[in-house]
């Protein structure tokens, strides 16, 4: 699970690109990279999770929770910063999705809701 991505710009950009490609591959409604980048709340929640998870693992638990709650308000998707999520994760129709503190999600998982 990616915990050191923020400290390495190359790794962070690689993961962002991979996340966008994951959406393009798994969602037939996704047309362009710019659309995915700007208009996919599941992706925004995932990126926020990645950063809050990084903060959580470095002891900034309150900051991580505040970020997590802010993104929940904006996207309707709640991912606890202590959850463990592998690469290739895609949330489709994410409104109301809750991923708790003890959740472990492996690589290349697609989550449908509704």
Task: List each model region and its residues.
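Terminal amphipathic alpha-helical/low-complexity segments used for targeting or macromolecular assembly
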Residues: 1-71, 75
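Structural signal for interior beta-strand "rungs" in well-ordered beta-sheet cores
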Residues: 72-113
């Amino acid at each position: 699970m990616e915990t050191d991505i923020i400290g390495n710009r190359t790794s962070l950009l690689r993961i962002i690109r991979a996340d966008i490609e994951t959406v393009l591959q798994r969602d037939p409604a996704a047309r362009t990279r710019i659309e995915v980048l700007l208009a996919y709340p599941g992706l925004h929640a995932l990126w926020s999770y990645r950063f809050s998870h990084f903060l959580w693992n470095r002891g900034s638990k309150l900051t991580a929770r505040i970020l997590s709650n802010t993104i929940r308000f904006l996207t309707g998707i709640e991912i606890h910063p202590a959850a463990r999520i592998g690469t290739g994760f895609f949330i489709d129709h994410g409104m109301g999705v809750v991923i708790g503190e003890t959740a472990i999600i492996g690589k290349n998982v697609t989550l449908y809701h509704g």
